[in-house]
UniProtKB/Swiss-Prot annotation:
A single cellular component GO annotation: mitochondrion
Gene Ontology MF term list: metal ion binding; NAD(P)HX epimerase activity; nucleotide binding
Full protein name: NAD(P)H-hydrate epimerase
YjeF N-terminal domain location: 10-217
EC main group: isomerase
Annotated cofactor note: Binds 1 potassium ion per subunit.
Cofactor(s) demanded: K(+)
Keywords of the record: Isomerase, Metal-binding, NAD, NADP, Nucleotide-binding, Potassium
Residue sites binding (6S)-NADPHX per the record: N60, N61, G62, G63, D64, G129, F130, S131, F132, K133, P134, P135, D158
Length: 233
């Protein structure tokens, strides 16, 4: 059975990938974001869900979102990026620049529920990852409220934004994505996920690291970058 990680385990696995296995942040971010794009194509085909709002947070989860948006643009989608608090680090500045040069639209104001319903077919939630601690910062309150109130399908990257990493929803009004894409290994909060699709992405975990943490990750089929897991309905 696949292991679901608590917050400390998730942080330690990441640290070992960086420190022991010498992966770089941008290397893992590229692989993670690409696997998210592939999972989205399997659940939301471009001919029906082509207009995508990608909501990016200030940390690595937001970086995954920027990478995902770039790959979606290459896969026949028309993404738009909402990035309310850009991170002033070269990696994130470069990712933003790449999206700009790919002619991906970036919007400056969070759309209303009504505007988003008319303008988009799908929302990608790449706001907060497994390091999130409540409360939500003021810059992100409007977009979190949009995610809570929208009727559009949502694809959440690793952690549904606003959820506790281990315990899931903190409030009844918290968002419930249609698709959850767990990265590296699922986190404990994924056991509380009731949506339609749960995918695993991030096909880069070394065998020795899998054994050390007893991750019991399923084998990815063929050359796939993601695979579907059972949901706990």
């Amino acid at each position: 059975m696949v292991k679901y990680l608590n917050q400390k385990e998730a942080i330690n696995v990441d640290l070992e990938l960086f420190n022991e296995y010498k992966f770089s942040v941008d290397q893992l971010m590229e692989l993670a974001g690409l696997s998210c794009a592939h999972a989205i194509t399997k659940c939301f085909p471009a001919d029906r869900f082509g207009r995508v709002l990608v909501c990016c947070g200030p940390g690595n989860n937001g970086g995954d979102g920027l990478v995902c948006a770039r790959h979606l643009a290459l896969m026949g989608y028309t993404p738009a990026i909402y990035y309310p608090k850009p991170t002033a680090k070269p990696l994130f500045e470069n990712l933003s620049h790449q999206c700009q040069r790919m002619e991906i639209c970036r919007i400056d104001e969070c759309p209303t529920v009504e505007t988003s319903a008319n303008s988009y077919d799908l929302i990608v939630d790449a706001l907060f990852g497994f390091s999130f601690k409540p409360p939500v910062r003021v810059d992100f309150v409007p977009v979190v409220e949009l995610l809570q109130q929208t009727k559009l399908p949502i694809a959440s990257v690793d952690i549904p934004s606003g959820w506790d990493v281990e315990n899931g929803k903190l409030n009844d009004c918290d968002l419930e994505p249609t698709l959850l894409i767990s990265l590296t290994a699922p986190k404990l909060c994924a056991k509380h996920f009731k949506g339609k699709h749960h995918f695993l992405g991030g096909r880069f975990v070394p065998p020795a690291l899998q054994r050390k943490y007893e991750l019991n990750l399923p084998e990815y089929p063929g050359n796939e970058l993601c695979l579907e897991l059972e949901t706990h309905k």
